[in-house]
Structure formats: C-alpha cells, structure tokens
Regions:
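Flexible loop/hinge segments that line or gate small-molecule binding clefts
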Residues: 376-399
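A short, basic-hydrophobic beta/loop patch
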Residues: 103-118, 123-156
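Extracytoplasmic "Venus flytrap"
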Residues: 298-318, 323, 336-342, 432-434
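Segments of small-molecule ligand-sensing domains
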Residues: 529-660
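Periplasmic-binding protein-like
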Residues: 356-365, 384-386, 472-482, 505-513
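An alpha-beta-alpha
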Residues: 320, 408-448, 537-559
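Short, charged/polar connector segments at secondary-structure boundaries
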Residues: 1-120, 130-131, 176-188, 215-280
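Hydrophobic alpha-helical segments within soluble ligand-binding/sensing domains
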Residues: 398-420, 512-532
Length: 661
C-alpha cells in the first residue's frame, strides 16, 4: 500500500476531526479525549488488577491515561495536527502498515475504569483502527477497581466484574444493580457459568445488531444505554428473535418501546403517582370536540383466574357490572378468564383486541409485561394493569390506598383488644403493604397506647390465623373483603374480628375494595377526553386512589360498641374528606429511628416504598427465600426488595444459545 494512499486517508481523518472539534466546541463540550488522571479522585487508593490481553470494544476507548498530547486527537481519536507534522508521519506509516500485508500487530496498553478504557500507549493505533471502523482493538489491560460503596453505579460495576469472569465480555456496562442477573436470566445462564467462544460471538453479534437498531432512535446515552434498552426488549421478546427479525422488524419493535425504555431506566423519576380522581364533569363541549372523545367504548377485562375460584376476580367482575349500570348502552363489556401466566395471557389479550376492545383492564400484577407487550403492539388501545410502581409509559397501572381503611380497623382493634395483643395477617411484602401494616399499628396505638401488633404472613409456611388464636390473641386482622357484600365481613375470614370467651368469632369491620368506582372514573375520563398521551412522553402514570375517591371503603359491624362505631365513622369521614392523614404524627420504627417528627406526612412514593415497621409491631418482613413458591411471582413483580431478588431462570442453561448456534 503506497504512502500517498495512507496520506490521503490521514487528510480525510483530519477533516473529520476538524468537523468533530467544531461541533463539540459549539455544544460546549470538550473536543479532546477524556483523561483518566483527571477523573480519578485525589489520593486515589483504588486497587489495580492485571486483566491481560483483551479484544476491547472500540467504542469503549474514550480517553488517555494522562494529559500529554491529548490536543492531537478529538474525543473520538480523529487526528487534529497538520499533515506535515511528525505526528502525521507516524500516523501515515501506521496506516500503511494496517492496509498492507503486515497490519498493526502490537496491542495497545491501557487502563480500564468503570468499563471504559484509557490509552497509556498506542493512541495513534487507536486513531488509525477507529478510522477504518475496527469494532475491536487488541490491548493489554490493567483494571482500576474502585472501593465498594452504596452508589448504584459502583455496585453494578462489582456485578460486572463477576459477569466478566464468566463471559469475558465488555460490550455491556449496566448502571443499576441487578441488571446483569436479569440479562443472564434472559439468556438462561447461571452467574458463574463459563461462556463458550461460540456464545460470546453470538451475543456480540446479536447485541450489536440490537444496538444499531436502537441507535437509530437517537436516544441520549444519559437517558438510556443500548444494553438497558435490550433488557426491556428481552422482557417481551425471546433472545433468539434477534437472529430471526429483519432489520426493519427489529427497528419497529425497538421504536415502539422507546418511551418505555426511557421511563424504565429512570425508574422512580419517571413514575407519576396520581392520588386523586380527576373531575371530568366540567369538561366543555369544545374540549370534548378537540380531544375527539368517543360516544361508545368497547371495554375488556382480562383475569388471571375466574370468579368461581378467585374472590379477587369476583370483585373486579362486580366492578364491571357497576359500569353496565352507570353507562348502559354506551359501553360494551366483555370478560376473559384464566390467563394464568404471561404466556397464556398473550393470546387472550390478542383475542380481546380482535373482538374490538378499545380499553383493556388486566387485573393481575404478574401480567404487567404481557400488558406492556400488547400495548406497544396496539398503540391505539388503552391498556391498564392492576398493579403499582410499574415504570412503563405505554400502559397505566392502578391500585387502592388500602392503608387508609387499615388505619380505621386498627383503631377498632386497639379499642377491642382487652389484653393489648392484636394479630395481623399480611399478604405479601409488596409495595404498599408495609404502609398498611404500619397504618393499622398507628390506628391501634391511637386507641390503645399499650397495643402490640403481632405480625404473621400468609405467603410463608404455617397457619397464621390458627397460630395467633392458639397463642391467646383474641383480635385478628386478616385479608380485606373483595367486594361490598356483607357476607365477607360475617365470614370472619376477612377484615378484623374478635374471639369471645365462648370461642365464637365476632366481626368488627373490614376494608373493602370498590372497583366499580375506579372503573367508572377511568371510563368517564375517556368519555370526557381526559385520557391523553403526548408523543415523546416518557412518564409512567400510576393511579393510587383512596377513600376520598370511593375506591376504598370500610364496612363496620353492627356488633361494634356504639362509641367505637361512632369513632370509626369520624375517622372514615376525615379520610373521605381528605383532612385526616394517618401518618402525620411522630413515628418511631422498630430499630429506634424516628421516621417522622409529626410535622409532615409522607409523599405517595414514600408510602409505596415503605420497607420498615413501627415500633409497636412484633415481627418482620420475610425474605424471598421464606416465601412460598406459589407467592414468589407476585413478590418478583411488586416486592419492596424486587431489585435484590436473584433473577429467575428462563429455561435451562444455554437453551437460548443452543437454539441459535
């Protein structure tokens, strides 16, 4: 290869570098490579580990070890010095070698820090190879390991180091703990399972195929990284599809998830919790015309079980019947049952859409990803999933502030517990449940300062109700009534009840779910043109309505003493009017920390993510290993510690790879 050809390549690279320099300066960014010595903290005590010879992903080489000669390159290692300089001569000679028979054979020397590489020796080799689009550059690498801290990025990096031991892959660099486990679960691999060379090649090829499709969306990396986008995509589609989809098909599926990817990466920043029912009664005719509000709606309900086997489904079906009474011929209502898993739910949801559904309520939290998949494939249909804290902008989620009703039944329990001991049977350690336990405990403490709440869980081994009663506890709070029907309170398997001296169970009161009120609110809002989603909107909307909206209620027993009944009614009125806050008081946790000094309440996000218990509660939140297998899926989906739960395997190890080799 002639020197003149190499010189022509240098001049081309120089023009690219000059253009990049101008663009970066115009954007107010540094036009030069990053300098590792400037990034590392002063008095740096990070350890250094020899990694050895690595095929470094070219795009991960972002800087130099020291500041010397950085002005010779742009941030992407394009040259900046004149073509007659000594620097240019060396660059041209390297270029000629690369284009000739010998090639560039010597590996570069560099440092790796938090997944990025900084060149100590071989800057011009990087410049030449990147100019010709080399996807990987061989280098001898030393890794700088930062001290382990609570910072999510550092925790994720420590997970990366374990991931690298098995995979020898640098192409994915997650920023959030738990993401490597999620990726391995999608691939059907164990965390310590060594990757074969064919597996590395396959993953590299598929990841870069996905990255190219994602890059076309031009999402800023500070919002979403390609590997973060891949995780959400893999929640909906199997890994092997990356080897089967055309470029156009892949780009379409990725583009449909754009805003969900942004919302899912931002997590809590992207979740908007709406605690009030919108008043749509005052929408003007002009507003309704502009919003193109419909005159008729086809509404579908998709349930994980059926009314004969699930009181939860029965409650939602009663909510559907409420819609029929309120809207009459303006709505067409259909129900679909036994969507027992996400896989079984997908064709059922598709059938609902094929039947003309314009609004689909999916009443089971474990079906949230099936809901999302349907939503991105049918963007004109409105999808809602009965769950909380889901960071997806394509769907809306809904649940009730049941803790408000628990506060009232707690006050009743405190007044009725003659021995000051009260049993509480909780369902799952999921978002909002600790708030309900604490609200109940605070209510009991209000009427009985000596009250102690003995906590049990129905999602672990044992017989909590029998155990509590056998232990001498006479007042017990159990699961909430699924509907307003009085029979659930009388059963004494729901709500709060008392065992008298004869061993009879006497009902006291129960929280109730009034799903019809929520469904009426949503449908009325759509009729009034209140359902809006702007293009490019990456906010996830979670409805979390309470007693002031009528979605949550309390049924009181006629057997309550008159004074207790009257006091419960006062509390109920205060919560319905929005003037009473169960948590606006001094609160101390089990470990002695003061969670509130009484001058403020808690924000909805704080209540949903509450992971501590009040100091008058005896008991603890179970670990994931203690939870019964039948209950684990719910906890994976909505658990207060879901980000720390080991990833669930999706098939046998290597199954996905074996299928596509």
């Amino acid at each position: 290869m002639s020197i003149q050809t190499a010189l022509d390549e240098y001049n081309l690279a120089l023009k690219q570098g000059q253009r990049e320099y101008r663009e970066l300066v115009m954007e107010g960014r540094s036009p030069y490579p990053a300098v590792l010595d400037d990034i590392l903290p002063e008095n740096n005590t990070d350890s250094v580990v020899d990694v050895g010879l690595v095929e470094i992903p070219s795009e991960r080489i972002i800087g130099t070890k020291s500041a010397g000669r950085i002005t010779a390159f742009t941030a992407s290692f394009c040259p900046l010095l004149d073509s007659k300089s000594e620097f240019a001569t060396k660059w041209v000679n390297l270029c000629a070698a690369h284009l000739g028979d010998t090639g560039i054979t010597d590996p570069i020397l560099c440092y790796e820090y938090l997944g990025n590489f900084y060149v100590q020796e071989g800057n011009k080799r990087v410049s030449v190879l990147r100019h010709f689009g080399s996807p990987r550059i061989p280098g001898t690498v030393k890794r700088i390991v930062p001290p382990l801290t609570d910072e999510p990025r550092i925790q994720a990096y420590y997970e990366f180091m374990d991931f690298y031991k098995a995979s020898h892959l640098y192409c994915v660099q997650f920023r959030h703990p738990g993401d490597y486990a999620r990726l391995l679960a999608h691939l059907g691999k164990k965390s310590d399972e060594i990757w074969e060379e064919s597996e590395r090649r396959t993953f590299n090829a598929y990841f870069h195929y996905f990255r190219d499709a994602f890059s076309a969306l031009q999402v800023p990396p500070e919002e979403v990284l390609p590997e973060e986008a891949l995780l959400l995509w893999l929640d909906l589609y199997p890994f092997q599809d990356l080897g089967q989809l055309s470029t156009a098909e892949l780009k379409k599926s990725v583009a449909a998830l754009r805003e969900d990817m942004v919302a899912n990466t931002k997590k809590q920043e992207a979740v908007k919790v709406q605690t009030k029912a919108e008043d749509t009664s005052k929408a003007s005719l002009l507003e309704r015309f502009i919003s193109a509000s419909p005159d008729h709606l086809n509404v579908a309900f998709v349930h994980q079980m059926n009314p004969g086997s699930s009181t939860w489904v029965l409650g939602h079906e009663e909510g559907k019947e409420h819609l029929k009474k309120v809207f009459g011929d303006r709505v067409t209502l259909r129900s679909y049952f036994d969507a027992a898993s996400p896989e079984l739910a997908e064709p059922i949801i598709e059938q609902a859409v094929a039947d003309g559904a314009q609004v689909v309520f999916i009443t089971a939290p474990p079906l949230s990803r099936a809901t999302l998949k349907a939503a991105v494939e049918h963007p004109k249909v409105r999808f809602l999933n009965c769950s909380v804290d889901q960071a997806y902008s394509s769907i809306r989620t809904y649940y009730g502030r049941i803790y408000e009703a628990k506060f009232i039944t707690g006050a009743i329990a405190g007044a009725m517990a003659q021995n000051n001991r009260i049993g509480y049977i909780a369902s799952y350690p999921i978002f909002g449940v600790p708030a309900s336990i604490n609200a109940f405990a605070l209510g009991a403490q209000m009427t009985n300062p000596r009250a102690q709440i003995e906590l049990r869980w129905s999602c672990v081994k044992g017989t909590p109700q029998a155990d509590l009663l056998a232990d001498g506890i006479r007042v017990v709070s159990n699961r909430d009534a699924p509907t307003q029907a009085k029979m659930y309170l009388d059963f004494c398997n729901y709500g709060t009840y008392l065992m008298n001296d004869r061993g009879d169970l006497i009902p006291l009161g129960t929280p109730i779910w009034v799903w019809g009120k929520f469904y009426e609110f949503v449908i009325r809002s759509i009729f009034a043109g209140g359902w809006k989603r702007d293009k490019g909107e990456s906010t996830a909307l979670n409805y979390w309505l309470g007693m002031d909206s009528g979605v949550i209620g309390v049924r009181l027993s006629e057997k309550l003493p008159e004074g207790v009944h009257q006091f419960a009614e006062i509390l109920k009125k205060g919560l319905e009017d929005g003037v009473l806050d169960p948590f606006r008081r001094r609160i101390t946790a089990q470990d002695g920390t003061v969670k509130s000094d009484g001058t403020r309440g808690f924000a909805p996000e704080e209540l949903l993510h509450m992971d501590w218990l009040c100091d008058n509660i005896v008991g603890s939140i179970p670990t994931f290993d203690q939870i019964l297998p039948i209950s684990q899926q719910m906890v994976r989906e909505l658990g207060i510690y879901r980000d720390k739960i080991p990833a669930e395997k999706e098939g046998k190890p290597r199954e996905d790879f074996d299928r596509i080799r």
